[in-house]
Structures are given as C-alpha cells and as structure tokens.
Amino acid sequence: MVWLWTLPWTFILVALIPLATAKSPDVHHSLQQLKKRDDDSLRDENCQAWIAPVWPGMSHMMVAATRAERDVSYNVSIDQLTYKGAELTPLVFNKYGYTQDGIFKSMDLLKSGMTSLGLDVYWNNKEQYWQLCPVIFPSSAEPGTPVLLQRRLTTDIVTCDQNATLSYFLAALSNHVNVTDNNLDVDLISLKLNLRTVETPIQSNSSSQRQKRQFRETSTSVTQLASSVLSSLLNASKTTRMESTGSFSNSDSNSSSNSSRMSNSTESTRTTSSTESASSTSTTPSTYTTGPQMLGNIVGSSYIGPRLYTPKDLHRDREAEPPRTYDYQGLSNRGFPLAHYILLEMKARVMVSISQNDQPDGYGWGSADQDVIFTKQALLGSSDPENTNENIAYENLQECIRLDPQFLQSINLTGAASWRTYSSTQQDPISNVSFQEFINCGLSPSINNTLAPGETLQGLMTESLWSWAEDEPSKCHNESVTRTQDRNTGLVAWNCAVLMPDGWHVANCYDTHYPLCRQGELAYNWAVGTQKVNYFDTAQEKNICPPGYTFSLPRTALQNIAAKITVRGVSGKTRVYKGGDTTDPDSYDTIDYGNTAFPVWIDLNSISQEDCWVSGGPTARCPYRTVQSHSVSVALLTVASAVCAGVAAAIILLQMDTQPIKKNSGRWRRLMSNFKKSEYESVPA
C-alpha cells in the first residue's frame, strides 16, 4: 500500500526535473498589474543601461531595434532592403592609414550597424597584384613597417603597410562574419569594390628610408599586435563561434579547404621583388581571363569565399522551377531572393559588387571575376547590385520627406527600382539629418565624405533606422500618459507598437487605438481600421479593418512611408466602406477620427518575451530562446536531484517503520469480551 501511495509522487518529481533545469523566459513580465506610486511614474532601474551608447558597437536599445527591423524584413527581396554604407577611404584609411589597425577600424563600422562598405583596391600592373595602398611601395619598404608615401594625383601623404593586404582585409571580414553568425546578429553585408590604378610615389627612396626609420620605433608594438591578431583571425575563421541556438557553421569540407585557399591567395597576390626599383616599368598583357591574380579568384578563394552570394548563385535561383527570386510583382526569374532565404537557408553573408571601375591599366575583366563579383551590367534581363545611377536623386524626394500625398502616385514606380543607392561627395556631404531622410525614403546612403565638426559616426548610426522613432523601443515610460480607464485597473503592458508620424513607438497594449490595415498583398495600399480596440482585441474577428484589408505592419522603408501618408490623411468625420453594394449608401459608415488617426496599432509586439519583437498578433511567440551556461544547468540539476533523493529516502524509512507487536493484546481481547457480556441485548425495563 505504501508503494501505491508513493508511485504518483515519484512520477511528479521526475516531471519536475526538466522544469527545474530549464531557465524560464521572462514571459508576460510587463503584464503584471502596476502598483500605484506616489510620483505617478513608471521608473525602470535599467533605463540608463538600456540607452547607454557603446562604441564600437550599439546600445542595447539599438540592438533590439535593429533586430526587430531585420526580422520584419526577412520576407523582402534583398534589393528592396536599405543598406547603411560607408566609404572606407575618407572615413577610415585617411585617418588611420592603410595599415592593419585601419582594417580593424573598418570592422568597427560593421559592429556599429553599417551593412555596406566601399573599398578602393589598386591594381599594380608592374607587380601584377591588387593592393589597398594607392601608391607603389618603394623597394626599401619592409613588411610590418608603415611608411609615408605621397600620392601624385592629390599630393596627399598616406601611411601604408605591406602587411595590410586585400587578403588580410577579407580575413578580418571573415572573422566578423563568424562572430556574428547566429540568429540574433546575422545580417547581409554588401562589399562594394572601387577598381583603381596604383600610383607611383613622388618621394625618392632616400626620403622613404628616413621616414621608415622615423616610423620604425613607434610602430613596433602595433606590428606585433597586428601580427598576433592576424593569427587569431585565421584561427577563428576555421571554427565558427556559436552564440545562440540558431548558430550557423561552415561545413567540414569548407573548413578543411580554407587553409590551402588562403595560403594560395596570399602567395598569388604578392609577387613583388624587393630588388626592383619602384620607378621601373614593364609591359604586361592588357587582358586576363584566368589566373590567381584575378580579383574573383582572390575573393572566392579567401576565407570569406564559402559565405558569398555570387552571380552564379543568383543565376541558379532564377532558373529554378519555380524561381526562388522575386520582384515588385511577386515570383519572377528577373528578381532577387528573399533575405530569409539567403541568410538562414543558404547561410550566405556577403555580396561583393563593383561600384566604380576606373579600368585599371593592364587588367581585364575575366570569367573568374564574373562568377564571383556582381557588376553593373544587366544579367538575364534584370539589374545587378549597384545597377543604378550613383548620386541618384529623386525629383519627389522632398514630397517623401514632407509625407506629401503626391508621393503615393509615384511610389509604385519607385518601389519597382532595384538597389536604390545614394553616394555623397565632399561637395554634397551627408549629415545626420539627410542620412535619416534617405533611409526613410527607401534609399541606401553611402557616406563618401569626411564628417563635419560635431558629427560622429555613433550619432549618425542612431538615426539609421526607417522603422523606430528616436530613442525607441524605449523602456523608460511615464505612467501619466496611460489612459484614465487603465489607471483604475492598473493594467499596463508596454509591449506593443504603434505607428506615429516620426516612426514606431512602444505603447501600452491596453490602450485603445485604430489598427493599421493593408489591402491583400499590395505593398503600398493601407487604410485605418474602423474601430478603436486594445492590442489584444486585434486578434478577434470583430471586423476591425475595412473589407479586403487585414491587420498588418510595414516591412520596408517605402511601405512605412506609404502607411504614414495614408494615416496622416485620415481625420475628422470620414465615410468608410463596410461591405456590400458600393452604390448603396447603407454600405458606408461615418467614423469620426478626430483631429488625427495617429497613433495606430501595427502588428508588432514583445508580449511573449521582453525585447523580442514579433508579428502575428498577441499570441505570436518569440523565435529565439535564452541559452544558459552549462555550469548553471549543472547547478540546477544538482539541486533537483538532491530534493528527489531526500524524498525517496524519507519514503524508504517510512516503509521500514512498521507497527510494533503489542505484548498485552490477549488481555485486551478478554476485557473487551467481558464488556460485551455485561451489555443488555434488549431494551431495559
């Protein structure tokens, strides 16, 4: 009998072990009732840490905002995404030199949120290799020792190191890809190459010797550090770091072949003879179609090679049945694949394209280049990356910035264009304000100018999102903005998003707003809902949207602009179609939207888990889960096992403790028998 009683408890304890060892996510943390405070404010002790700037890198707030914007754009073709770009020559190399330290600073731009880098590469026709330094190295230059060289075209003095090669840059880029190769941080990087011809230095070898001695003393520690970091880069590229449960890793075959690829490319890109004079010239063939010196071979055989999305991949995806590419009308064999497909299925991370081609002397574009690097030429009837005019300027850009309804008349033509880019110049520089405006209007700006005094890349990157407004998604809210009816019940949940004229804001899910609705699959056709509801009621079938419309959210910058313009045009008493015969007056309702319909709900929330913004209604689940360390799991399992062992020991001891035999049991039975005899068996008189 004791075992029958203990058996259910044993099963219960066994079932509790997995619960004890798993770290429960912070689900519905913000849905708890808010305690009233005397200062009538909701203060988050982590508020300052949430918004604190980080460099290189992003604040916790920017990380959450960038991830949310990336996630809602997963089902968008890659040519419709906005890329934050920077030209490395004016922003990095002019300041830090063409050195290994300069390459590390370039990777810092990617950590801060940049997704497009412009790199100048110079063809040395005499030595037959590509280099990052714009000037030919003198014969007396030693690898690892920076030298000062003067350019002929601009007369600028540049600092160059022979160890800072194109292969080294690609290895550093591969290391960044490995570090961010997880579901939380993965993104698509665009590497735009500008093909130039190397210049002959102005100064003589004797002056170069003096400058070399001047630099040698100060550069020794930097060279040693750079060499050790290069070794770590190459080692890190062989084993992919796992940072989340959805981490990606290269296949074993790719990892095993990378070492030989890197060594071959390094040897092939450097054929310089230290005994030859820098001023000597040689005649070489003007066109190459094969060989290790080809730019495509250098890029393809580098450590980043297995993570490239190439023209050959695009051709294969377009020729598939059905095609895996999309244009503005849907499936098309002339479009581009979705971001989700490239990042999560193909596990590709980098696209290399030619932004500017100065036709370097002695170098011809060959088949090896065309298979790896995208060009501006048309391919299979469609445009390749960067196949738009540099310095593109919309005639209606001001209409977009002003949220002018006239912009909707041309937005479909604008959305049909691929790879919409804008590159600044020193004469027409990009500032913090214009950077934000270009991104909001669906352009991918590239900074090709030095920043003005008072402007920093960190300040510029805080204005680099088309989705969230400034300082959003915020954890610092004031309870005074909560509606009166919500204050009476204390129901506050800052886990839902609304659309405002300046972008997305975090709002209380229990507030009532009109929902934002989209017409079918039409990207730029939006409408305001027909009734005010709290966010949780958007999942109910209450006809909250006009017929043919559903509750949704913008997934691109142009969709966001179209939604803003639509909502801004709704105010006062408005006739809204509710279904039926369009000629019947009874098929319309009159809704009073007041002075403005803003704010409106969008299909975005972090209800399932804090800081994890997902679409799909209030019941949508976060696709990421918290990964805890092995030591924590062992500790929790030890505690659970100890509790189970203690309970089991107690059960065994109770079973062994049987009822003792009473020695006077016979006497007790005799007393009970005599007592029964003395009782009457009938009713007494």
UniProtKB/Swiss-Prot annotation:
Annotated spans, Disordered: 201-221, 238-295, 309-328
Gene: MTC6
Coiled-coil regions listed: none
Ranges of compositional bias, category Basic and acidic residues: 310-324
Superkingdom, taxonomy of origin: Eukaryota
Protein's UniProt keywords contain Membrane: yes
The name this protein goes by in its record: Maintenance of telomere capping protein 6
Subcellular location: Membrane
Residues in the Cytoplasmic compartment per record: 655-685
Keyword terms of this UniProt record: Glycoprotein, Membrane, Signal, Transmembrane, Transmembrane helix
Membrane-side (Extracellular) residue stretches: 23-633
